[in-house]
């Protein structure tokens, strides 16, 4: 049996320095999207009109109840997929100019 050693094996080292500094600096400039202030109210009104709890709505759109709570409190980072599911479940527009109006 012959054992061979490869040149440079085991020499993988993490280089920090400049790349790490660029990442830290770039994170400060990132602006997260925010919900339109009328969206949480529209979700609450539509859900209450359908006499649904947050838990029931979450089950209907296959999300966690905490997600509904975040959207209704306005603290959620908006996701187009979740907003689309909410629109279909509540039959109310949650994006665009006519927020809170019934879907056609």
From Swiss-Prot:
GO terms for molecular function: DNA binding; transcription coactivator activity. Pfam families: HTH_3. It comes from the Eukaryota. GO terms for biological process: positive regulation of transcription by RNA polymerase II. Residues 54-73 bind DNA. The keyword DNA-binding applies. InterPro entries: Cro/C1-type_HTH (IPR001387), Lambda_DNA-bd_dom_sf (IPR010982). GO terms for cellular component: nucleus. Residues 43-97 form the HTH cro/C1-type domain. Keywords: DNA-binding. This is Vegetative-specific protein H7. It comes from Dictyostelium discoideum. The gene is cinD-1.
């Amino acid at each position: 049996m012959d054992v061979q050693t490869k040149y440079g094996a085991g020499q993988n080292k993490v280089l920090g320095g400049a790349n790490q500094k660029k990442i830290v600096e770039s994170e400060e400039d990132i602006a997260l999207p925010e919900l339109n202030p009328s969206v949480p109210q529209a979700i609450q009104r539509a859900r209450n009109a359908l006499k649904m709890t947050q838990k029931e709505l979450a089950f209907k759109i296959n999300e966690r109840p905490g997600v509904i709570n975040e959207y209704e409190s306005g603290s959620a980072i908006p996701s187009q997929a979740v907003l689309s599911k909410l629109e279909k479940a509540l039959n109310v527009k949650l994006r665009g100019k006519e927020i809170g109006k019934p879907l056609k």
